Amino acid sequence: MAANTEQLTEEQIAEFKEAFALFDKDGDGTITTKELGTVMRSLGQNPTEAELQDMISEVDADGNGTIDFPEFLMLMARKMKETDHEDELREAFKVFDKDGNGFISAAELRHVMTNLGEKLSEEEVDEMIREADVDGDGQVNYEEFVRMMTSGATDDKDKKGHK
């Protein structure tokens, strides 16, 4: 597990130490789980509440609700790896979002899939949009796109009673 932190540069470690110290209000060498979200956001990350809970349970070995600096470093090393993946997803989203309005319409999805050699029927494209479109606005925003790409939402057709 510690091998993750070996890929961090001294500069990154110093930056994380600074951020950590900023939120270690009482200077006892630990930050509370509530403060973790604030620390992550200050470093350009944008974790959801669920992601924060997952991260905390991954590194809070003794379950005391606080994270010490070595645990924090491991966490940040892990998040840096995920950020690379996130950059790739953002680039992919831009490919689909032809007009750059922050949403993927059925027409945009159909256009890109066709160019990729995927000949999809109207129904298949509409189905992909429906499954990814969590807020029901008929388009796919970035969060929905990420969820679709990381959870394989389009593979769940059979589970939703589609026969």
Curated annotation (Swiss-Prot):
Signal sequence range: none
Domain of life: Eukaryota
Residue ranges constituting the EF-hand domain according to the UniProt record: 11-46, 47-82, 84-119, 120-155
Positions bound to Ca(2+) 4: D133, D135, D137, Q139, E144
Complex formation: Associates with the spoke-associated complex containing CFAP61, CFAP91 and CFAP251; the association is calcium sensitive.
Residues annotated with N-acetylalanine modification: A2
Function: Calmodulin mediates the control of a large number of enzymes, ion channels and other proteins by Ca(2+). Among the enzymes to be stimulated by the calmodulin-Ca(2+) complex are a number of protein kinases and phosphatases.
Post-translational modification: Trimethylation of Lys-119 observed in other calmodulins is absent here.
Molecular function via GO: calcium ion binding
UniProt-listed SUPFAM superfamilies: EF-hand (SSF47473)
Protein name per Swiss-Prot or TrEMBL: Calmodulin
Residues that coordinate or bind Ca(2+) 3: D97, D99, N101, E108
Family that this chain belongs to: Belongs to the calmodulin family.
SMART domains according to UniProt: EFh
